[in-house]
A protein has these predicted regions:
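Beta->alpha turn/N-cap motifs
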Residues: 61, 77-83, 99-100, 116-118
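Extracytoplasmic/periplasmic solute-binding protein
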Residues: 1-29, 73
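Alpha-to-beta junction loops
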Residues: 70-78, 92
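Short helix-initiation/N-cap motifs at beta->coil->alpha
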Residues: 55-69
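Conserved C-terminal helix/tail region of periplasmic/extracytoplasmic solute-binding proteins
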Residues: 175-228
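Pocket-flanking alpha-helical
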Residues: 6, 65-66, 82-89, 220-223
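Extracytoplasmic/periplasmic substrate-recognition and gating elements
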Residues: 49, 88-151
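Glycine-centered hinge/linker elements that transmit conformational signals in sensory
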Residues: 25-57
Length: 228
């Protein structure tokens, strides 16, 4: 919850939007402070207080993964970068799936993570343009994508010929349980504010009595580009 990449999946899951329906209009404010957003906030307050829930930021992921080895953890939200450690901990029990559904008050939805991609670019002012373009085309081809996935876990755009439990789950996640990460400059107001809000929930500073005020202040700062 204290990771600003993960926490929006709950708000987006019940229909919340950031900067327009497709995240491309910075003039349209984030609307997570409405009735649905309040229901999600109250849901997260209860989730953080649940003894079966563990909140580990990326730098502490190893602590949570170790719980798999001890048989004390049923599921973990992460990415391809943690596959080796999790698969080592679970052995034959290793599996992956798209994000789950949940119910926050009167609202039901499916968690929706940010989806994004990377590209291989060429400097338009480089001296050897033909060579640079040829290299970029080569690095972007299906064979190189497959190698990067097998060696580094970088998810390929072209997964032809790859049958893998994690890649299949990632494909399902992108297709069924994701929204495009907004790239507008107004997103600068999101990251630190979302992290602070998540940490406040985990610390118990956001509770059912002050949830609306805290949520309103959080989103106001997001839309203003300020900080809590």
């Amino acid at each position: 919850l204290s990771n600003s990449w993960y926490i929006p999946s709950f708000f987006c899951g019940v229909g919340g939007t950031m900067f327009g329906p497709d995240g491309t209009d910075g003039s349209v404010p984030c609307d997570f402070d409405d009735e649905k957003g309040l229901a999600v906030t109250n849901y997260l307050i209860d989730l953080a207080a649940n003894p079966k829930f563990t909140n580990q930021a990326n730098e502490e992921a190893g602590k949570a993964i170790n719980l798999f080895t001890e048989g004390k953890l049923g599921a973990f939200f992460s990415g391809s970068w943690d596959r080796e450690a999790i698969e080592t901990a679970l052995g034959d029990n290793f599996a992956c799936a798209q994000l789950p559904s949940f119910k926050a008050g009167d609202y039901e939805g499916t968690m929706k993570s940010y989806a994004g991609s990377k590209a291989i670019g060429v400097n338009p002012t480089c001296e050897n343009m033909d060579v640079a373009v040829a290299l970029a085309v080569y690095l972007g081809n299906a064979d190189c994508q497959k190698i990067r996935y097998e060696v580094r876990g970088v998810v390929p755009l072209d997964s032809t010929g790859i049958d893998d439990v994690m890649l299949n789950a990632i494909t399902d996640t992108v297709n069924n349980t994701s929204v495009a990460q907004p790239l507008v400059s107004e997103m600068n107001g999101w990251w630190s504010n979302a992290e602070a809000f998540g940490k406040a929930i985990v610390a118990g500073e956001v509770n059912h009595d002050n949830a609306q005020d805290k949520l309103t202040n959080f989103i106001a700062n997001v839309n203003a580009g300020g900080s809590l």
